[in-house]
Amino acid sequence: ADGDELIELAPPGDESLADLANLMNRRHRWRRSRGAVLFDRPEGRFRLRDGELEVHVTEPSPARQLVSEAMLLMGSVVAGFGQEHQLALPFRSQPMASLPTTEELERIPEGPAQDAAIKRCLSRGVQGTCPMPHFSLGLPSYVQATSPIRRYADLVTHRQILAQLAGTEVLPEERLGELIDDLDDPLRQSVQIAREDQRHWQQVWLARHRDQSWSVIFLRWLRPQDSLALVHVSDLAMDLVGVAQGADPTPGQTLSMTVAHVDSDRGELQLQFA
């Protein structure tokens, strides 16, 4: 909140953060002009704090955009450094996607449903030793480099750059490629575990509030033959997957939803639309 105030008010003698935010906004617009796919909406996550389950909603803000854009800028600069010095790095890329046309998007109400229509067209990111464009970031090349404590690949990037600057031996491309291959499965598993963790706590939360009626936005059918639906719960700022009954909605339609059945131990969730 303090950062947002400094950016928005730019008090005399303390304009540096606002100036930096303006620079990052220009960078943000530049990426958008290059086709970056941007989703600036609240995001909810469940957290256990002192044994209590609570919803934490992260709202978009000037300070968060500044930090996010600065992190992407660093990743772009590091990628450029690697290319300039022919340095093997764990580049992240994303294949080009064919997005819905303007006419197709106009048939879907603006908001989470439009976002879902775009997201389903995007391919999974790829990590490799060769610099390639990252479609949704709107960048010609990119390397994650801001979290060497949290991500091993970021640590490898830092060690490669430090070795290059010091004139000492760097990892050759072949060895780095082997490291990336070794990391691929554990990274996929960690992402899947994180998703399953959130899905579990969603179901625990809904079990505790199963008498409540929720206003949801229908996003799409994941498996129409099984009535498996994807909906957005605005009060929780998160998407929800469950077997749905009671209506045949279209993307973007707002519905009233109740929980017909939930078993968090079995991972079962049935929704009733009205």
Which residue ranges define each predicted feature?
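Electropositive polyanion-binding surfaces
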Residues: A1-L255, A260-Q270
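Short beta-strand-to-coil "C-cap" segments at the C-terminal boundary of structured domains/repeats
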Residues: Q272-A274
